[in-house]
């Protein structure tokens, strides 16, 4: 049986509208176009060259479609100012020693919860992505003297191009503007941003986000090593649906849903992370003013069909397709298609069967599901998974985005409601301060040391 192999997917960011603009105007890629009036000193942390015109007063105002930062929009835009009203930040580090470092108040205004790398001790690097490196760090509680473990996502500066350095800043600001505002047990908690320099002139200067430490790695590894039982997979399915349904309720398009971006917490709960490509597309509860997104953003095998052939599309509906691919990989270990374009043999066959049986209306039809599983090798493993899971996956994999079911409706189905799920979690830690949150990885994880759950997804040591 022929199947598309399962492998790690890199994130791509191809903005079709930006490409079109750049072809018309070679100077269209600028800090001012992306951020509005942003102080040039802020970008010195990433060694980004800024032209003098960037910091001049202008009528350019940050818009939600430009960068998703609600805490900035509320503070600056509501008072009829553009980002930023502070025209010259001049971040200066003061004090006689490294332990007396202080930030310029104006930079603190942008990142009010910012801390310093000297608050943390670096232990080791555990992962490396396109724009960042994940490092395990510790913080010693000043009162109890206990070590607390965290994961620091360090955004690397690149020496290659202005565009890549600018993209790194975009990822950082997007993650910090979105992720800390989310309150859900299946969303990775960000503790604070952190400056990674002792001098503003330090060439290694930059920023990082201090997050929960998930010592068991990502979901990709568990799928790859084939250690998950059917019970585990069903539990994970429900947790994934809960996490993405929560994002949809908050009108946030993640745009890069994949196993690599789902971590396994110390208590065995899934933690969705990596919001560097995410966008806020509307206000919670408002179905009338949802803003469309553009470009092929995410990972190729998980991208919805509309990302390849439409200039603008609904990011929330595209996430539902990605969720379907993710669940298919979770249960079978194979991609259904290399990409959801007509040049892909199996996707083309999928579309042909759908047209013949349903007229491209619903992938819920039993006749369609029977035929695609029979005729498409990459979908044949679906015959061996629970009927409920199969129906969910195929219903989400509808080329017509308007006919993809909402995740709330899926969570409300009888089959999903009956699933045993690790949902008896506590969220008490989510509102505590940095000193109070304790993710201690100093001790080996054993089944006896864990808080009782319905399932134990931990790897035995």
UniProtKB/Swiss-Prot annotation:
Has a role late in meiosis. It catalyses: L-seryl-[protein] + ATP = O-phospho-L-seryl-[protein] + ADP + H(+); L-threonyl-[protein] + ATP = O-phospho-L-threonyl-[protein] + ADP + H(+). ATP binds at residues 126-134, 153. GO terms for cellular component: cytoplasm; mitochondrion; nucleus. Residues 120-416 form the Protein kinase domain. It is found in: Mitochondrion. PANTHER family: MAP/MICROTUBULE AFFINITY-REGULATING KINASE, NON-SPECIFIC SERINE_THREONINE PROTEIN KINASE. It is an enzyme of class 2 (transferase). One of its GO terms (biological process) is signaling. One of its GO terms (molecular function) is protein serine/threonine kinase activity. The gene is ppk24. This is Serine/threonine-protein kinase ppk24, mitochondrial. Its EC number is 2.7.11.1. Keywords: ATP-binding, Kinase, Meiosis, Mitochondrion, Nucleotide-binding, Serine/threonine-protein kinase, Transferase, Transit peptide. The active site is at residue 256. SUPFAM superfamilies: Protein kinase-like (PK-like). InterPro entries: Kinase-like_dom_sf, Prot_kinase_dom, Ser/Thr_kinase_AS. It comes from the Eukaryota. Belongs to the protein kinase superfamily. Ser/Thr protein kinase family.
């Amino acid at each position: 049986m022929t199947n598309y192999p399962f492998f790690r997917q890199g994130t791509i960011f191809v903005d079709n509208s930006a490409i079109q603009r750049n072809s018309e105007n070679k100077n269209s890629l600028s800090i001012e176009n992306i951020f509005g009036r942003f102080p040039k000193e802020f970008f010195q942390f990433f060694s980004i060259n800024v032209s003098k015109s960037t910091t001049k007063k202008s009528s350019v105002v940050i818009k939600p479609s430009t960068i998703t930062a609600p805490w900035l929009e509320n503070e600056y835009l509501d008072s009829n100012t553009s980002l930023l009203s502070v025209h010259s930040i001049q971040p200066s580090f003061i004090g006689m020693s490294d332990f007396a470092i202080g930030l310029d108040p104006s930079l603190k205004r942008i990142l009010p919860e910012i801390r310093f790398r000297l608050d943390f001790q670096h232990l080791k690097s555990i992962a490396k992505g396109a724009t960042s490196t994940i490092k395990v760090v510790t913080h010693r509680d000043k009162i109890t003297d206990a070590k607390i473990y965290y994961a620091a996502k360090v955004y690397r500066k690149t020496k290659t191009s202005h565009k890549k350095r600018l993209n790194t800043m975009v990822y950082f600001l997007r993650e910090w503007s979105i992720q800390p505002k989310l309150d859900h047990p299946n969303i990775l908690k960000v503790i604070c941003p952190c400056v990674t320099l002792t001098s503003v002139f330090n060439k290694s200067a930059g920023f990082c986000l201090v997050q929960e430490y998930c010592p068991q790695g990502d979901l990709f590894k568990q799928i790859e090593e084939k250690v998950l039982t059917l019970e585990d997979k069903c539990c994970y399915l429900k947790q994934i649906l809960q996490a993405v349904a929560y994002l949809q309720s908050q009108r946030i398009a993640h745009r890069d849903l994949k196993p690599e971006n789902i971590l396994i917490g110390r208590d065995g709960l899934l933690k969705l992370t990596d919001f560097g490509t995410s966008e806020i597309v509307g206000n919670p509860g408002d179905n009338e003013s949802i803003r469309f997104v553009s470009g092929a953003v995410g990972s190729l095998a998980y991208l919805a069909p509309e990302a390849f052939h439409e200039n603008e599309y609904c990011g929330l509906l595209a996430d539902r397709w990605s969720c379907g691919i993710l669940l298919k990989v979770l249960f079978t270990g194979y991609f259904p298609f290399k990409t959801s374009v007509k040049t892909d043999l199996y996707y083309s066959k999928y579309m042909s069967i759908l047209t013949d049986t349903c007229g491209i209306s619903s992938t819920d039809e039993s006749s369609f599901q029977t035929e695609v599983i029979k005729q498409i090798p990459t979908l044949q493993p679906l015959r061996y998974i629970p009927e409920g899971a199969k129906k969910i996956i195929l219903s989400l994999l509808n080329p017509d985005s308007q006919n993809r079911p909402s995740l709330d409706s899926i969570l409300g189905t009888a089959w999903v409601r009956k699933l045993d799920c690790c949902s008896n979690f506590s969220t008490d830690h989510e509102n505590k301060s940095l000193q109070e949150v304790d993710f201690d990885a100093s001790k080996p994880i054993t089944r006896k040391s864990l808080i009782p759950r319905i399932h134990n997804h931990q790897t035995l040591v």
